[in-house]
């Protein structure tokens, strides 16, 4: 079985940061990425379980996967790829 989180183009460590910092860092990082690239976000703020999916919907990025069963949470976002 392949781990979807294994080979992102970029990784963002947001451990220890609290709202709104993780989403602000995601936005800044995604700005410097090419369409189609993937970003692995690692966070432990419970607000990210709401904020990261909301950011993806609002900014037309695709949330490929999320693992929020325990901390640290992991999210895999694909830039500029609106969910179908």
Swiss-Prot record:
Provide the alphabetized UniProt keywords. Answer: Cytoplasm, tRNA processing
Record pathway: tRNA modification
User: According to its UniProt record, which residues of this chain constitute the active site?
Assistant: 19 (cysteine persulfide intermediate)
**The species this protein was found in:** Yersinia enterocolitica serotype O:8 / biotype 1B (strain NCTC 13174 / 8081)
Protein name, per record:
Sulfur carrier protein TusA
User: What NCBIfam families does its record include?
Assistant: PRK00299.1
Give start-end ranges for the coiled-coil region(s).
Answer: none
Database matches in InterPro entries: Sulphur_carrier_TusA, TusA-like, TusA-like_sf
Q: Which HAMAP family match?
A: Thiourid_synth_A (MF_00413)
Pfam families, sorted:
TusA
Is Cell inner membrane one of the keywords? no
């Amino acid at each position: 079985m392949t781990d979807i989180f294994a080979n992102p183009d970029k990784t963002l460590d947001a451990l220890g940061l609290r709202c709104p910092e993780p989403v602000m860092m995601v936005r800044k990082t995604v700005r410097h990425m090419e369409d189609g690239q993937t970003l692995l976000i690692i966070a432990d703020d419970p607000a990210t379980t709401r904020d990261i999916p909301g950011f993806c919907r609002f900014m037309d990025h695709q949330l490929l996967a999320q693992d929020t069963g325990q901390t640290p949470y992991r999210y895999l976002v694909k830039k500029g790829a609106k969910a179908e």
